[in-house]
């Protein structure tokens, strides 16, 4: 394949990975309240719908908020020929206004606060941080990381880094979440560009140390001053390095990590992505391993799927019979609800992942990203 074909293949893998992770993981969430199906029934093939509310379901192959917000961000990047914070907020607002069943109340509330209260940011990130209204997501959760993969297509290194911070400003402005965001996006970009696992891990380790130091000296006082992070937590260089490097090294060495602490969902997802990257020989093996670990397994599977898909690419993914079947299920799923089955709900057409849309998005991101 030519360079363009190789890169667009990996970009398609990235997008498909997010969608498959969502569809495959969500039905097996441990919460019975959300209609979770026991993990023992995981076959590796998408065969259950995602439950929305008590009695409503998507059609099989329709993913949740992970893939919808990923597509919304892709649309924003393509329209802006790069990352534009205001346009990104606009596309997130459109997503909310579609009344998609996947829009969570807290996410909706926080994005609406941003749109209602925040002026257009200046070129300085400090001004942006000071202007963001306080919200419930000022903690190390994974709600920003789940939509992060498209940021890897941004060509300029510093613009890409700032885009990660801007994204976290919308819903998850926490030092841990921001650093995990930056490192994960760099890993996805390196995977898209065809770098080896060994090189990706080496560079990510260096980036973690660099970003922990940056935040220790430049950002933490601003965040704490804006009441965005708990003031009783010492977000020093040593604290950040300890927490993030411990998860990163545990993943790379195949060691277990605590998956039950709700305040550290972002690090858990970060851990899952790098565990699967370093210890899986195929997309299918990696994604099933993460789902079986429990915890926030649908979001973890989507985030992991984005990185694995970027690394393996669509053509290699399709060499596995289960993954090939899942790809066909996702891109051929019916977006509209079955009118004869009133408990089935529709996805907004804007976020439906068809073969045609997948090809167009990958080609557009290739051009924008100078990949």
Regions found by a protein language model. Name each.
Residues 1-371:
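Structured, active/binding-site neighborhoods that engage oxygen-rich ligands
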């Amino acid at each position: 394949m030519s360079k363009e074909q190789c890169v667009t293949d990996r970009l398609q893998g990235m997008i498909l990975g997010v969608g498959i992770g969502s569809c495959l993981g969500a039905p097996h969430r441990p919460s019975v309240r959300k209609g979770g199906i026991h993990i023992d029934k995981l076959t590796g093939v998408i065969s259950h719908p995602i439950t929305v509310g008590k009695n409503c379901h998507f059609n099989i192959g329709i993913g949740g908020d992970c893939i919808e917000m990923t597509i919304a961000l892709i649309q924003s990047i393509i329209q802006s020929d790069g990352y534009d914070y205001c346009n990104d907020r606009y596309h997130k607002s459109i997503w909310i206004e579609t009344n998609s069943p996947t829009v969570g109340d807290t996410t909706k509330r926080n994005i609406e606060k941003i749109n209602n209260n925040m002026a257009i940011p200046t070129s300085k990130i400090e001004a942006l941080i000071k202007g963001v209204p306080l919200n419930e997501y000022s903690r190390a959760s994974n709600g920003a990381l789940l939509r992060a993969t498209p940021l890897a297509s941004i060509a300029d290194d510093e613009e890409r880094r700032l885009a990660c911070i801007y994204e976290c400003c919308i819903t998850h402005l926490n030092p841990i979440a921001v650093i995990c965001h930056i490192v994960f996006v760099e890993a996805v970009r390196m995977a898209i560009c065809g770098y080896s696992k060994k090189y990706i891990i080496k560079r990510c380790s260096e980036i973690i140390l660099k970003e922990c130091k940056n935040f220790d000296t430049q950002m933490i006082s601003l965040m704490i001053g804006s009441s965005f992070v708990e003031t009783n937590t010492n977000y020093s260089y040593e604290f950040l390095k300890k927490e993030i490097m411990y998860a990163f090294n545990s993943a790379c060495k195949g060691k277990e990590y605590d998956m039950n602490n709700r305040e550290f969902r972002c690090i858990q997802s970060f851990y899952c992505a790098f565990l699967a990257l370093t210890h899986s020989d195929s997309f299918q093996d990696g994604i099933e391993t993460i789902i079986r670990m429990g915890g926030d397994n649908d979001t973890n599977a989507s985030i992991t799927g984005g990185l694995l898909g970027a690394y393996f690419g669509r053509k290699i993914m399709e060499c596995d019979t289960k993954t090939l079947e899942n790809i066909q299920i996702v891109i051929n799923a019916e977006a509209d609800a079955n009118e004869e089955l009133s408990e089935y709900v529709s996805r907004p057409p804007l976020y439906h992942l068809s073969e045609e849309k997948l090809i167009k998005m990958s080609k557009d991101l290739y051009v924008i990203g100078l990949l």
